[in-house]
Every structure is written in C-alpha cells, then in structure tokens.
A protein has these predicted regions:
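Acidic two-metal-ion nuclease catalytic site recognized across multiple nuclease folds
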Residues: 102-103, 107-158
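Mg2+-dependent endonuclease catalytic cores in nucleic-acid-processing enzymes, primarily RNase H-like
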Residues: 1-117
Length: 158
C-alpha cells in the first residue's frame, strides 16, 4: 500500500490527466482497488488508473513502423513491456538516470527467439537460477512506459 500513498501524495504536482500504471497481478490488485476507491471518494477526476496484467496477452496494436503488430513480435506481456522501453529509448522519447543498478537490471536479463520467431525474455525463475535478483526497478520503468502513445509524458510535469 506504500505505492497507493505515494501516488496520492505526488498527484497534486502534475497537471492534466495522470496515468498510473499498476501491475494488477497479485499484490498490485489491492493497490488498484484502493486507488479506485480514493479516486471516487476524493473526486480525483484527472487520475486514470491503468491496471496492467503482466501475465496477460500482448496487445494487437500496430507498432511504430506501421507494418508489424506487437503480438507478432513479443511472446508475452513482460517482453512487450520491456520492448516499449527499448523503443522509447531508441526514439529518444524517454531518458534514464545514470543508475548502475537500473542499467544492470536491464542488461543482465537474457532473451531468446521462440520457435514461432517471437522474442521472449528470460523468466525471473531462470534469472534466480543464475543467481540474479528480480529486476524490480527495470520492471517499474517498463510498466511506466506502457501505453506511452496515449499521452505526452512532457505535458505532465510543471
């Protein structure tokens, strides 16, 4: 519930609609529910809560090149989310802090191509077998880039 409190505290700093992407699986479901309650109680109409099912299906959206669909490139939602970060960095839509831990998390996770030619990130269980901790910070960045095309990130901060 720390995330819910932080979202409510930080909310007034921003203008326009505020998109809060939450991994809605497991513990995140409670955060999503509580934020929805507070949004209704406090009449926070600018807050848009986006539940993301990291275990769900990859969207059928057309990618930036207009030729391929995300579901034809990425095997699962987590791989797709990480792909949105890669795309945003390549297009210079976002930049990351010089954070050694974050860089390590983004660069230590292996990937492979499936028999259907789709990209698949190494699972957290496979990472653990290699002695690597869960890439929680990288996952948070990936989650924050989800649906990046629905709004201009620069319009949110004063």
């Amino acid at each position: 519930m720390q995330l819910y409190r932080q979202a409510i505290t930080e909310f007034p700093r921003y203008r326009g609609k505020i998109y809060i992407n939450i991994d809605d699986c497991g513990l995140g479901g409670g955060v999503t529910d509580r934020l929805e309650e507070v949004k209704q109680e406090e009449k926070l109409t600018r807050m848009v809560i986006v539940p993301v099912n990291a275990a769900g299906k990859v969207p059928e959206e057309t990618l930036g090149d207009g030729k391929q669909k995300a579901c034809d490139i990425y095997d699962n939602m987590t791989t797709y989310l990480w792909g949105t970060v890669k795309d945003a960095l390549m297009m210079e839509e976002v930049s990351l802090e010089n954070d050694n831990e974050l860089v390590a998390q983004f660069t230590c996770r292996k990937y492979r191509l499936t028999s259907r030619g789709k990209m698949l990130l190494e699972s957290k269980e496979e990472m653990k077998k290699r002695g690597i901790d869960s890439p929680d910070r990288a996952d948070a960045v990936a989650l924050s880039c989800y649906q990046k095309k629905t709004f201009n990130i620069g319009s949110l901060v004063d």
